[in-house]
Amino acid sequence: MMKIFNTLKNKKEKFKPINSNIVNVYVCGITPYDLCHIGHARTLVFFDIMIKYFQYKGYRTNYIRNITDIDDKIINKAFHKKEKYNLLSDFMIKEMKYDLNSLNIMPPNNEPRVTNHISDILEMIKILLEKKHAYISKTGDVVFDISTYRDYGKLSKRFEEKKQLLNNKKNKINFKTKKEKDFVLWKMSKPNEPSWKSPWGHGRPGWHIECSAISDKTLGNIFDIHGGGSDLIFPHHENEIAQSKCANSKFNVNFWVHTGMVMFKKEKMSKSLGNSCLIREIVKKYDADTLKYFLTSSHYRSQITYSVDNMEKSKSAVKRLYRSLHNTNYFYNLPIKEKFTSKFIDAMNDDFNTPKAYSVLFSISRQINYFKNKNPEKANQLSTVLKNLSNIIGILNENPDSYLNNKLKFSKDKINKIKSIIKKRENYRKLKQWEKADEERKKLKYIGVCLEDTIQGTKWFKL
C-alpha cells in the first residue's frame, strides 16, 4: 500500500489514482528570468523521482509542469537588459532544459507556457466575475475577493486573512479599493509593457490564475496530485484552490505535495536574497549524481542545508555505490532471489522515503563487495538490482570506470608513482608482510587513490 503526505489534510493518506491505470500530476514550474539554482533542482528532482517510481510500479503518467513566461521579474530584467521579454524567457527556458538534462531529469508530458493560455485565463476570470467572486478595483485590475470563499486558509492553515477580510466587509470598506489580502487576477499594463486584449482593458494575468486555468485545461477539474515547493503553499496554492473552487465547485485535487526548502546559512536559498547556487556551477564543481544525492538524502518534505561539508559527504556516498559496481556486470539478467527490492519498495511506498531507500542501496552495495571475489555471479546479480533501483532515484547512470577513475586528472609522473606503490604493495602481499602492504595502501590514500583487490588483480581509482 502506497501512502503520500497530503498537505491539505496534514497527514499521510493511502494513494489510489482516480483512474486506475494513470496518474495525473501538475507541478508549478519556473519563472524563466534567470538561471536555475539548486532550490529549483530539489523540487524538479523530487517530482522526477515520483514520476519514475509511478512508472516503475506500472502506472502510466501524465505529468504537466507549467512555465510562467510572463511576470514582473521577466519584464524588469528585460527592461534593464534592453531586450524583449519573450527573447529573455525563451533563452532562459533553453538554459533550464540544459540544466535539467545535465541532471538526467525526464521532460514532462506537457510544458505549457502561460502566454499560450491567455484565452483560458480570460475565460476563468469572466466566470469568477459573473459569480461575484471578483471585482474591478479603482486601478482597473480584476481582483479576487477571498472573503467570498469560506474555506480560504484550509491548505496553509492561515485563517487570520479570512477573518480580517470578513471584518472589513462588515465595516463596509469600499470594495472598489483593493483589499490587502485580495489578489490580482488581471493586471492593467503600463505603457510599453507586454499586454493582451481583454474585456477590462489591455493587461496581463496575475500569477495565481495562470496555474488554475492551465491545470483545468490540461488535466480537467479533478486530478491526482498538485505539487511544488513548500514556499508555494501560501499564497500561491491557497489562492489557486480558492479561485478554482469558486470557478467550478467540482474542482478537486486529491493530494497536495510540497518539497522542503534548500537553506544556505539559515536562510532560504533564493535569487532575491542573492544566496543561490546555480545548478550548473554545482554540477561542474562536483557532478550530477552528487548533487542529486544531496537533494534526496533527506526526506523531500524536510529542509536541507547546503554546505561544502554536506556536498563532500554526498560525493563520498555516491562513490561508495559506484565502487561496488566497479568490476561487475550490472547488465546480468539471471534472476536472483533477494530481499532488497521489496524493502526498497516499502521505503518508497512510505511517502517516497528516499533516506530509507538509500539504506537499502547501501546494504546491496555491501553485499556486492562481499561476494565480488567469493561468488562473482551473485555479485553481478546484485549489481543489476542496485543499478535498477538506483536509476529510479536517478543516480548511478554513468559507467563506474569512467566515473571513478578520472586518471587523466593525474600527471604522468603521478600515475607512474601510483603504479610503483601498487607494485611494491603487491610484493609485500606475496611475502605476507601485511603491515608493510597496508602502509603502501595508506600512502596511496594520502595522495587520493583508492584500491580494490579483485580476481583479475588490483584496480585503482581516484578518491
From Swiss-Prot:
GO BP: any one term: cysteinyl-tRNA aminoacylation
Keywords: Aminoacyl-tRNA synthetase, ATP-binding, Cytoplasm, Ligase, Metal-binding, Nucleotide-binding, Protein biosynthesis, Zinc
Keyword Cell membrane: no
Motif mapping: 'KMSKS' region: 268-272
SMART domains per UniProt: DALR_2
EC number(s) stated in the UniProt entry for this protein: 6.1.1.16
HAMAP family: Cys_tRNA_synth
PANTHER family per UniProt: CYSTEINE--TRNA LIGASE, CYTOPLASMIC, CYSTEINYL-TRNA SYNTHETASE
Protein name: Cysteine--tRNA ligase
Gene that encodes it: cysS
